[in-house]
A protein has these predicted regions:
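Short, well-ordered alpha-helical microsegments
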Residues: 53-57, 147-152, 251
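Glycine/proline-rich, positively charged
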Residues: 18, 32, 81-200, 208-211, ...
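Hydrophobic residues in well-ordered beta-strands that form the structural core
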Residues: 43-44, 74, 196
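Short catalytic-loop micro-motif centered on adjacent basic/acidic residues
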Residues: 41-48, 138-142, 240-242
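N-terminal binding-site loop/beta-alpha segment at the start of enzyme catalytic domains
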Residues: 1-70, 127, 133
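Structural motif corresponding to the early beta-alpha repeats
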Residues: 48, 64-85, 109-110
Length: 370
């Protein structure tokens, strides 16, 4: 990762929107501020924002700055190829969409036991290594959502992989499902640099319950998001921490505490541990709002938004959540009770959530009769 200047990356996944389209004017401001502060790592994938992430990146970054000014990561996602022959045309379409001739990093996206078998059957890894040999990719890596044992298997079978992107934050650190700590330890064993995704857990660690927020506020040292990102960035071998920034204020906040990065001190680590305990006591739905589930939903249910209002009601117990459920998130889309239990959402969820059962819980909470 020799071209990276600092250890904060810009994830092009949660960009500001104007209706269905990316707010390009604000995104340009965000990109300009990020680069001006000395940061240069950008991360995208074709599935982000239904393809709009790549085209926004071209409009806001690659068409406006020299290629040597930024490091660019893209990904090969299982949904977009069925055979080995599909991979190269898809890759070339990604280059065109992003407006570049090469990618600094090309990641085998969302590797899990199921996805890994598909990638192997289609010789996706071999194709990626060939693209590297041709100079179209500088580094080949993976992004990963599965057990530490599965990660160890992949890195053992493909030791030439150069980086691993992991979900890593203080709530998931010892979570038995996500296994952030154990996966991180596997990367250390294999000597692979780690790129962190979801350091703020889809925004959940920026919008803490009041009692948890009070613990961090008492430190008088920064935003809730700042402690989450600094927690992740403070581990040896973690070379990059991605933040899916949604407005200029978030960019400015991240720049302020990551420009001259300092790991959490003992007092801050103790506070984060207390927040971790409070957060876990709330029994919240651990959705990161990646929105992979919404694209194939036949009932057009805005699943992450319904989970967000469910969490909000558990935390705040006020009328706002009911209002947003009935008047905003289900006004033009499906209600939780509209779920036909087809299971498409669960097959693509990186968090392995039991979405169908959770939607039934949401319906029971918000669609009470009488």
């Amino acid at each position: 990762m020799e071209k990276t200047k600092k250890n904060l990356g810009f994830g092009f996944m949660r960009l500001p929107m104007q209706g269905e389209e990316v707010d390009l004017a604000q995104t340009r401001q965000m990109v300009d501020a990020f680069l001006a502060a000395g940061f240069n790592y950008f991360d995208t994938a074709h599935g982000y924002l239904d393809g709009r992430s790549e085209t926004a990146l071209k409009a806001c970054l690659t068409s406006r700055y020299p290629r040597e000014d930024y490091v660019l990561t893209n990904k090969l996602t299982a949904n977009f190829f069925k055979t080995e022959a599909d991979i190269r045309p898809f890759f070339e379409s990604q280059l065109a969409a992003c407006g570049v001739d090469d990618f600094d990093f090309y990641l085998m996206h969302a590797q899990s036991m199921k996805n890994f078998e598909h990638f192997k059957a289609c010789r996706a890894y071999e194709t990626a290594f060939a693209l590297k040999a041709e100079g179209k990719v500088r580094h080949v890596g993976i992004s990963f959502h599965d057990s530490a044992e599965m990660l160890d298997r992949i890195l053992t079978e493909y030791p030439q992989l150069e980086a691993v992107q992991l979900q890593f934050n203080y709530v998931d650190y010892d979570d038995p499902a996500v296994q952030s700590r154990r996966c991180y330890e596997v990367c250390r064993k294999h000597g692979k640099p780690v790129i962190v995704m979801e350091p703020v857990k889809g925004g959940n660690l920026a919008r803490l319950p009041e009692d948890a927020a009070a613990v961090l506020d008492a430190l008088h040292g920064g935003s809730s998001a700042s402690y989450a990102i600094r927690f992740a960035a403070g581990f040896p071998g973690i070379r990059m921490v991605l933040s899916g920034m949604s407005d200029l204020r978030q960019v400015e906040d991240n720049i302020a505490f990551m420009r001259d990065f300092k790991p959490l001190d003992e007092t801050e680590l103790a506070a984060v541990k207390r927040v971790q305990e409070i957060f876990r006591s709330k029994s919240l739905i651990p959705c990161t709002a990646c929105r992979y589930c919404t694209a194939g939903c036949p009932q057009h249910i805005s699943i992450p938004d319904l989970f967000a209002v469910m969490n909000a009601k558990q935390i705040h117990r006020d009328w706002n959540a009911d209002y947003y459920y009935s008047e905003v998130y289900t006004k033009n889309g499906g209600r939780a009770s509209d779920c036909i239990r087809c299971g498409k959402c669960e097959r693509v969820c990186p968090q392995h959530l039991h979405i169908r059962d959770l939607l039934a819980d949401v319906a029971a909470e918000f669609e009470k009769k009488g």
